[in-house]
Amino acid sequence: DYGMPVKLKDTMKAKKLFGDWQETLIWSCLQKVMGDIYVDNASDPQSAMAVLGDFCFFAGNAEEDIVSFKPENCFQDFIIMVPQSEEWAELIVKNYGDRAKPATRYAIKKEQNIFDKDTLRSAVNSLKPGYILRMIDADLFALCRSSTWCQDLVSQFRDYEMYKKLGIGFAVLKGKSLVAGASS
């Protein structure tokens, strides 16, 4: 029976739909680390969406019921929808009209040894006096959680132990105030 999307318990049933899509957020959902997978049919999925934070990835057969579905744990007023195919992209526009705004998302390079450490050192050394760069530890994790503007730096992790095991991030502080950050 196909129709109303269901949360998939055996997430690996959707793996074939996502194919070799090299996207960390999708794999986090498939491996049940974070996020959820919703499908058109739990026993034989043909359409799927992986939802993690502000991101939603569509795979398999483009289905209107999947595109228009909002999981009960999605409270934000927006979501970044990433279509696997042109059919999914067209369905997003059909369903959301002017609210769907196409954008280019810049991907992080995943190749080994591509990161330029000198560029990073230069950025760190250019911090103005009074600003410091710190790795996100338990104290900064708690600070991120308590500040609306930077909750997203750590919001996908249920607690600091999970973050310490699976995440990494850095924050810039001016005095005791967090002013910038980047995190997985």
Predicted regions and their residues:
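A generic structural signal for ordered alpha-helices
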Residues: 7, 16, 20-21, 70, ...
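Amide-forming acyltransferase catalytic core, primarily the GNAT-like/NAT-type
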Residues: 1-41
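Short, charge-rich amphipathic segments
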Residues: 1-8, 29, 100, 136-152
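Conserved beta-hairpin
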Residues: 31-51, 167-182
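Residues that form generic nucleotide/phosphate-binding pockets
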Residues: 13-17, 28-29, 69-72, 91, ...
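Generic secondary-structure transition motif, activating predominantly at the C-termini of alpha-helices
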Residues: 18-22, 30, 96, 100, ...
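Acyl-donor-binding surface of acyltransferase catalytic domains
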Residues: 35, 41-142
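Flexible, substrate/cofactor-facing loop regions flanked by secondary structure
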Residues: 117-184
